[in-house]
Amino acid sequence: MVRIAIAGAAGRMGRNLVKATHQNPLSELGAGSERPESSLVGVDIGELCGIGKQGIVLVDNLEQAVEQFDVIIDFTAPASTLANLALCEQHGKKLVIGTTGFTDAQRQTIEQAAKKIPIVMAPNYSVGVNLVFKLLEKAAKVMGDYCDIEIIEAHHRHKVDAPSGTAIGMGEAIAHAMGNQLSDVAVYAREGITGERSRNEIGFATIRAGDIIGEHTAMFADIGERVEITHKATDRMTFANGAVKAAIWLAEQPAGFYTMTDVLGLNDL
């Protein structure tokens, strides 16, 4: 039984992670945290998340419950995730990262830590999205040289980063399959008289509206035909169940930097 701590357990995603951990027969809830200023610190996590009293209260720092868990699942914010990364390094814990919006320097810090502890980091934990990443690699190898490639993503009004980590992941899958770095070919905004698009660029468009959980489309457009690969999420439990699956898998792994491709065994597809 893998004991899991949920960072940001009172948030939208955090509550789903608590439920997913509780429902999975191979995991159990060990701890949960919230920001120190939250009025929910000290509240029973189970009662808060609708799974019944668990005898585990929200703490303002997972250091206080470090003996109660094996793996942290963190879908919070970069600064908070890096603090939990340091805690995991210090105490030999494992870390599943669903946070997005890291700088290149912050990502390097995470990759460096993975030399000491096991870490899974992914922009999206749904099985469907990670299958889409593989499909995009194959589509890019076949169509990338002669098609215009655009990525459109939509999320709820509360999402703070753009484009989404999943959209970036889609762009990276396409760019790498074509032998490019995404930073060299990405175009994140167009306005005014932009001139004709170049053939090798990957364009991004972002929508923030209402309560959209997550929709992503990659478009390969030629003259006379267009291929679109789309994923639509309708329930956050999809991501939560995938993250718990990753935590259970990670519990048996040595130190290293892993992705959901590793967790799902998609490398050979």
UniProtKB/Swiss-Prot annotation:
<comment type="similarity">
    <text>Belongs to the DapB family.</text>
</comment>
<comment type="pathway">
    <text>Amino-acid biosynthesis; L-lysine biosynthesis via DAP pathway; (S)-tetrahydrodipicolinate from L-aspartate: step 4/4.</text>
</comment>
<keyword id="KW-0963">Cytoplasm</keyword>
<dbReference type="InterPro" id="IPR022663">
    <property type="entry name" value="DapB_C"/>
</dbReference>
<dbReference type="GO" id="GO:0019877">
    <property type="term" value="P:diaminopimelate biosynthetic process"/>
</dbReference>
<dbReference type="Pfam" id="PF05173">
    <property type="entry name" value="DapB_C"/>
</dbReference>
<feature type="binding site">
    <location>
        <position position="35"/>
    </location>
    <ligand>
        <name>NADP(+)</name>
    </ligand>
</feature>
<dbReference type="GO" id="GO:0005829">
    <property type="term" value="C:cytosol"/>
</dbReference>
<dbReference type="GO" id="GO:0050661">
    <property type="term" value="F:NADP binding"/>
</dbReference>
<feature type="active site" description="Proton donor">
    <location>
        <position position="159"/>
    </location>
</feature>
<keyword id="KW-0457">Lysine biosynthesis</keyword>
<protein>
    <recommendedName>
        <fullName>4-hydroxy-tetrahydrodipicolinate reductase</fullName>
        <ecNumber>1.17.1.8</ecNumber>
    </recommendedName>
</protein>
<feature type="binding site">
    <location>
        <begin position="165"/>
        <end position="166"/>
    </location>
    <ligand>
        <name>(S)-2,3,4,5-tetrahydrodipicolinate</name>
    </ligand>
</feature>
<dbReference type="InterPro" id="IPR036291">
    <property type="entry name" value="NAD(P)-bd_dom_sf"/>
</dbReference>
<keyword id="KW-0520">NAD</keyword>
<dbReference type="InterPro" id="IPR022664">
    <property type="entry name" value="DapB_N_CS"/>
</dbReference>
<feature type="binding site">
    <location>
        <position position="156"/>
    </location>
    <ligand>
        <name>(S)-2,3,4,5-tetrahydrodipicolinate</name>
    </ligand>
</feature>
<keyword id="KW-0028">Amino-acid biosynthesis</keyword>
<dbReference type="InterPro" id="IPR023940">
    <property type="entry name" value="DHDPR_bac"/>
</dbReference>
<keyword id="KW-0521">NADP</keyword>
<dbReference type="GO" id="GO:0016726">
    <property type="term" value="F:oxidoreductase activity, acting on CH or CH2 groups, NAD or NADP as acceptor"/>
</dbReference>
<feature type="binding site">
    <location>
        <begin position="122"/>
        <end position="125"/>
    </location>
    <ligand>
        <name>NAD(+)</name>
    </ligand>
</feature>
<feature type="binding site">
    <location>
        <begin position="8"/>
        <end position="13"/>
    </location>
    <ligand>
        <name>NAD(+)</name>
    </ligand>
</feature>
<dbReference type="GO" id="GO:0009089">
    <property type="term" value="P:lysine biosynthetic process via diaminopimelate"/>
</dbReference>
<dbReference type="InterPro" id="IPR000846">
    <property type="entry name" value="DapB_N"/>
</dbReference>
<feature type="binding site">
    <location>
        <begin position="98"/>
        <end position="100"/>
    </location>
    <ligand>
        <name>NAD(+)</name>
    </ligand>
</feature>
<dbReference type="Pfam" id="PF01113">
    <property type="entry name" value="DapB_N"/>
</dbReference>
<keyword id="KW-0220">Diaminopimelate biosynthesis</keyword>
<feature type="active site" description="Proton donor/acceptor">
    <location>
        <position position="155"/>
    </location>
</feature>
<dbReference type="GO" id="GO:0051287">
    <property type="term" value="F:NAD binding"/>
</dbReference>
<comment type="function">
    <text>Catalyzes the conversion of 4-hydroxy-tetrahydrodipicolinate (HTPA) to tetrahydrodipicolinate.</text>
</comment>
<feature type="binding site">
    <location>
        <position position="34"/>
    </location>
    <ligand>
        <name>NAD(+)</name>
    </ligand>
</feature>
<dbReference type="GO" id="GO:0008839">
    <property type="term" value="F:4-hydroxy-tetrahydrodipicolinate reductase"/>
</dbReference>
<keyword id="KW-0560">Oxidoreductase</keyword>
